[in-house]
């Protein structure tokens, strides 16, 4: 099972936005480059990096940070405001093949195929709030069944998603794996769970779901709990070493 540390960028700083709300932004005195470098040295095969400035404000202010992070592109899945092919190509040119997409895919599912055609490995970000699908930096919602949506996107080549529980994101409350597990079992796509992966108990439950789904629950993303030390690197590594922890 993959255990994936998360780093959100806003105004060139490492942040967490509780429940995805800009007014609830927590800034951390951590250098994102040094943080990624340390995580790679610790042996994490994948790190989740999201450019919130671009996702929410369509700003390129974090681009200099991303350019520096490109040295570790093989260890990073990048997301945030990837809505046009030109920007996806720019990220690909930096070495970021694994790209997280959401809003554009909801508007135009064929965007998944277009990304694959240029060499991107797209992962769909399925962000849910009280059963509804959120998009555009979590500012808008669609009243659509997540399982139906994922099965629909499979027709366009979808193979993997990140499922985030927005109401738990950045709160240190426990993730509810019931919907995550249902999505995995009823669609057959690989799922990475996010939002509320806040304790060793969360990791234990994730590992159980990983086994029940025969590995379809591919892993979990740990954000605030990692940044604040609620989950230590040592504990995260211990769970990452169990079962299959391949990125592909």
Curated annotation (Swiss-Prot):
Pathway assigned to this chain's UniProt record: Amino-acid biosynthesis; L-histidine biosynthesis; L-histidine from 5-phospho-alpha-D-ribose 1-diphosphate: step 4/9
Protein's UniProt keywords contain Amino-acid biosynthesis: yes
CDD domains reported in the protein's UniProt record: HisA
EC number(s) stated in the UniProt entry for this protein: 5.3.1.16
Pfam families given in the database record: His_biosynth
Catalysis: reaction(s): 1-(5-phospho-beta-D-ribosyl)-5-[(5-phospho-beta-D-ribosylamino)methylideneamino]imidazole-4-carboxamide = 5-[(5-phospho-1-deoxy-D-ribulos-1-ylimino)methylamino]-1-(5-phospho-beta-D-ribosyl)imidazole-4-carboxamide
Entry keyword set: Amino-acid biosynthesis, Cytoplasm, Histidine biosynthesis, Isomerase
Catalytic-site annotation from UniProt: 8 (proton acceptor), 127 (proton donor)
Localisation per UniProt entry: Cytoplasm
GO BP terms in the entry: L-histidine biosynthetic process; L-tryptophan biosynthetic process
Entry GO MF terms: 1-(5-phosphoribosyl)-5-[(5-phosphoribosylamino)methylideneamino]imidazole-4-carboxamide isomerase activity
Matches recorded under InterPro entries: Aldolase_TIM, His_biosynth, Isoase_HisA-like, Isoase_HisA-like_bact, RibuloseP-bd_barrel
This protein's GO CC annotations: cytoplasm
Isomerase as UniProt keyword: yes
Record PANTHER family: 1-(5-PHOSPHORIBOSYL)-5-[(5-PHOSPHORIBOSYLAMINO)METHYLIDENEAMINO] IMIDAZOLE-4-CARBOXAMIDE ISOMERASE (PTHR43090:SF2)
Similarity comment: family membership: Belongs to the HisA/HisF family.
Protein name: 1-(5-phosphoribosyl)-5-[(5-phosphoribosylamino)methylideneamino] imidazole-4-carboxamide isomerase
UniProt organism field: Thermotoga neapolitana (strain ATCC 49049 / DSM 4359 / NBRC 107923 / NS-E)
Lineage: Bacteria, Thermotogati, Thermotogota, Thermotogae, Thermotogales
């Amino acid at each position: 099972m993959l255990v994936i540390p998360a780093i959100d960028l806003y105004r060139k700083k490492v942040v967490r936005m509780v429940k995805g709300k800009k007014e609830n932004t927590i800034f951390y005195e951590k250098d994102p480059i040094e943080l990624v470098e340390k995580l790679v040295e610790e042996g994490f095969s994948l790190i989740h990096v999201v450019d919130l400035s671009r996702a929410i404000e369509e700003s390129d202010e974090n681009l200099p940070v991303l350019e520096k992070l490109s040295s570790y592109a093989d260890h990073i899945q990048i997301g945030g405001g990837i809505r046009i092919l030109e920007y996806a190509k720019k990220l690909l040119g930096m070495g970021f093949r694994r790209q997280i997409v959401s809003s554009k895919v909801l508007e135009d599912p064929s965007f998944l195929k277009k990304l694959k055609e240029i060499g991107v490995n797209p992962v769909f970000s399925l962000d849910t709030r009280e059963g509804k699908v959120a998009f555009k930096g979590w500012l808008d919602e669609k009243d659509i069944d997540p399982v139906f949506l994922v099965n629909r996107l499979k027709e366009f080549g979808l193979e993997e998603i990140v499922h985030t529980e927005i109401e738990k994101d950045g709160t240190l409350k426990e993730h509810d794996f019931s919907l995550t597990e249902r999505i995995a079992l009823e669609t057959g796509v690989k799922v990475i769970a996010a939002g509320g992966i806040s304790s060793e108990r969360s990791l234990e439950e994730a590992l159980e779901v990983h086994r029940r789904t025969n590995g379809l629950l591919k892993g979990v993303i740990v954000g605030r709990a990692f940044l604040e030390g609620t989950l230590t690197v040592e504990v995260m590594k211990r769970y990452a070493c169990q079962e299959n922890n391949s990125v592909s």
